[in-house]
């Protein structure tokens, strides 16, 4: 299966083509996608764009819903922004 | 880096615009296009198929080349009758239509319990969606919990992809499910599906009258505590996949002023809502499963394209599928004890971290929003709304645009 490489918090990650950014973040080993308003670690709940818990920064763009965005080669993903 | 967002006004007017590219939306678009209508289909996911057909080739029989598909696009407002405002990642679009079919589907009902905000506690459909999106689950220990037939489908999928499904905890009583099972005898197709499911689930513990009362872990989930027959025990696991049935996504129909029924959006025989030229099909009219969604979509598609006679030929098929939906709802209704799940310090609103103690001091949604910010975060009450409807009997407040967070630039219309 063809793979592509992107970076999650600076770490190079290879994912199968067609993977969502949420999967890449999980593969990178990050359990925390974002920090809640009281400082709790949070990660995806609904997997379908409803809950907004999967928000990360992609190529400098904040609040991207990682469950709904396909990975692209060379993407720079930052968690916990 | 600031984004360059272009505002585009589409010159074309579509005969039929379909919102949602799940089974109901695909069936509606296909039938409308076959009837000669110019059809646009809008969906916020990268590909058509909805949740049930995510990352699969199954939608293909329903995909019609004549349908113009706008993927990765969210409807955030309806600035004037016959116009939809869409936001895409780098551009906005105004789309004009004569008839509108809303097939916005359903989401899982989440109920708050201690620890439910920990990473790796997810919806049942949520974990399945993530696995389909590339999350590796091979060898992961997973507890599947909550309610409804979705739990079985999810457990089967997860196991089929190498996960160690420790058990399925179904909150409904076995007697209710048994009665539901008897009802299936009238539907041979459903019975065959049930038998196929059993084969894929062989050896997985299926515990009825069982539900999670707490998830534990430090940085992420480490174990879940379950309750059954007054006994509690703890299961170590990597993921908890937990959803208490489905609830319809009625926000967009509500924005258009469509009247609601007991189960979702109210529709007539032709799937038309209380608003002229606006139709609803699929789970948004009431949870009924794939077969009902398809036939409702077909009816709406024919009707919106001006073919009421073709629509009428499908009324009988819809009726039998609706009976199945009713039986399903009765069998898996959430039990009253689940109202005791959240503790005082359990967050009900995950966007604004509002505890159950604070929300419970309020007497209605409006007061809770004003005093606690519950439901005021990015999800706009889509997660806590379903919970509070069950926990406190609160009906959702009115919907105002933007129906989802939108870029500031999207709110300023050109010209």
Q: Across the structure, where does each feature detected by a protein language model lie?
A:
Chain B
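A conserved FAD-binding loop/helix module that cradles the flavin
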Residues: 281-316
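N-terminal Rossmann-like FAD-binding beta1-loop-alpha1 element of flavoenzymes
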Residues: 16-38, 154-158
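Beta1/beta-strand and adjacent pyrophosphate-binding region of the FAD-binding site
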Residues: 11-24, 140-145
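Glycine-rich FAD pyrophosphate-binding loop
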Residues: 34-51, 166-175
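Glycine-rich dinucleotide-binding loop and its adjacent helix/turn
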Residues: 106-143, 147-154, 262-269
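FAD-site-proximal beta/loop scaffold in flavoenzymes
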Residues: 122-131, 239-288
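A Rossmann-like FAD-binding core segment of flavoenzymes
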Residues: 62-88, 95, 161-251, 261
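Active-site-proximal substrate-binding core of FAD-dependent oxidoreductases
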Residues: 272, 302-341
